[in-house]
Amino acid sequence: MSIPTVIAFSGNIGAGKSTLLRGLEAAGYEVVPEDFSRWGQLFEMALEDPNRWKFSSQLKIMLIQSEIQRAAKKSDNRVVVLERTTECVLDFCNVAMEQGQILPAEHDMLVQIWEKVNVPVDAKIFLNTPPEKCMERIAFRGRAFERDIPVEYLSSLHSKFTRDPDYIMSGLESKEVVLANAIELIEKIVSRNVR
């Protein structure tokens, strides 16, 4: 049994990750999208009262993402494509601390937990879409819990996500071009990662 190549796409809210992952799944890749339903009530509570619940919700999301990354390493498929990583959760935590939604001590604790539970992926690809374009896409898809996101929040996240990806792809082209570019990049990564 060979070990799969685990590749994660990160990017801002509204960057085009979910659309891209649906295309990759249709192309035959094993895909694990974000599943908001697994985050449960804590996620909803954090949206309503972030100063009270942001730490707890981010901890839960980090633990779930760690489980996803661990399971991906055990897949029988040649490639597993994930939506986000535990590092992305830390990026959300960094912004939450900057906005006063979690305390520095809570942030330090999340980093310590991340150091214990993180399961590294083989490649992180950042889907680079400017915050203003993300705002347009967020408005178009109409998710209730996203309707009040300010562009400043997206700009803060964007600056965090751009810090340490292995690869950067533009999210501005048509979904067909983004998909073709992603498949080409995935296959290049897999060919370098044959075990």
Swiss-Prot record:
<protein>
    <recommendedName>
        <fullName>Putative deoxynucleoside kinase</fullName>
        <ecNumber>2.7.1.-</ecNumber>
    </recommendedName>
</protein>
<dbReference type="InterPro" id="IPR027417">
    <property type="entry name" value="P-loop_NTPase"/>
</dbReference>
<keyword id="KW-0808">Transferase</keyword>
<keyword id="KW-0418">Kinase</keyword>
<dbReference type="GO" id="GO:0019136">
    <property type="term" value="F:deoxynucleoside kinase activity"/>
</dbReference>
<dbReference type="Pfam" id="PF01712">
    <property type="entry name" value="dNK"/>
</dbReference>
<dbReference type="InterPro" id="IPR002624">
    <property type="entry name" value="DCK/DGK"/>
</dbReference>
<dbReference type="GO" id="GO:0005524">
    <property type="term" value="F:ATP binding"/>
</dbReference>
<dbReference type="InterPro" id="IPR050566">
    <property type="entry name" value="Deoxyribonucleoside_kinase"/>
</dbReference>
<dbReference type="InterPro" id="IPR031314">
    <property type="entry name" value="DNK_dom"/>
</dbReference>
